[in-house]
Amino acid sequence: MVEPLLSGIVLGMITVSALGLFVAAYLQYRRGNQFEI
């Protein structure tokens, strides 16, 4: 079994990475729309 602390760190890193990707994609999407309009 994986230690709770290790699993918590892994889950936290995955969540932060996913959030960062979503934010970056959203900002790029808005930036692209601003340039197109």
From Swiss-Prot:
GO terms for biological process: cytochrome complex assembly; photosynthesis. It is found in: Plastid, Chloroplast thylakoid membrane. The keyword Transferase does not apply. GO terms for molecular function: electron transporter, transferring electrons within cytochrome b6/f complex of photosystem II activity. The keyword Plastid applies. It is a single-pass membrane protein. Component of the cytochrome b6-f complex, which mediates electron transfer between photosystem II (PSII) and photosystem I (PSI), cyclic electron flow around PSI, and state transitions. PetG is required for either the stability or assembly of the cytochrome b6-f complex. The 4 large subunits of the cytochrome b6-f complex are cytochrome b6, subunit IV (17 kDa polypeptide, PetD), cytochrome f and the Rieske protein, while the 4 small subunits are PetG, PetL, PetM and PetN. The complex functions as a dimer. This is Cytochrome b6-f complex subunit 5. It comes from Trieres chinensis. The gene is petG.
